[in-house]
Amino acid sequence: MPFQQREQNGLVWFTADVLNQIPHGFSTRMGGVPPAPWDSLNLRPNQGDGPEALRENYRRFFAVLGLDEHRTVLSQQTHTANIRRVTAADAGKGVVRPRDYTDVDALITNEAALPLTVFSADCGTVLLYDPVRQAVGAAHAGWRGCAAGIVEKTVQAMEDAYGSRPADLLAALGPCIGRCCFETDGDVPAAMRDALGADAEPHMERRGVKFHVDLAGLNRQWLLRAGLAPEHIEVSGVCTACRPDLFWSHRKMGDQRGVQAAVIALKECL
């Protein structure tokens, strides 16, 4: 299986085989400390369960990934297609010191031991790795970001900043709401058609007066359009809305819920 479900000390997370050369992971809601309704591994800053519980949740998740949570850099998501190039000067922003940026839904870096963190609770997350140029990226790609082309723009940003070639990139698309549960009105399919044209059609279907949309499939389509090889892309295939016992889901829980995190980092040279 391209994605692996892992468990350690009650904490459950997913990894992708395509990224097995570097530290990375997609968290679930299992293995943290807060009480309901934030139980238990909520990684959402400034939401619900207090700073001490949040710090402990970060410590636990980053420990199983073999990473230092004090050096991670958090996105500041507003469903845009904005991308931030991260350097050591950003280390810890969002965790141990305030973020001095807003409207950032994707992060890229070519510096080691500088974990990039993006969030979701049904939206898509995409982790990227360039094993040739040694660079990584992380993108939050909900339907608005997908329609705005954030995945392709993140690939382009890595190409512009680090000389990455799309054919070299490896990508993992984490758990997100599936076609089974992502029921929408016509505005979402219309936005996808405007962005992807006929390539969007296989990932959407009409059921009565509503539409069902395959968000992961659409984000994968953007990766293919950007030039990634199909064999370099892995999709979890897990629907967050189908598994509210395992994942935070905005569709199932509304605003009273936490978030998952998707994290990626380059190894530190010893």
Write out the residue ranges for each language-model feature.
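Active-site microenvironment for binding and transforming phosphate-containing groups
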Residues: 1-270
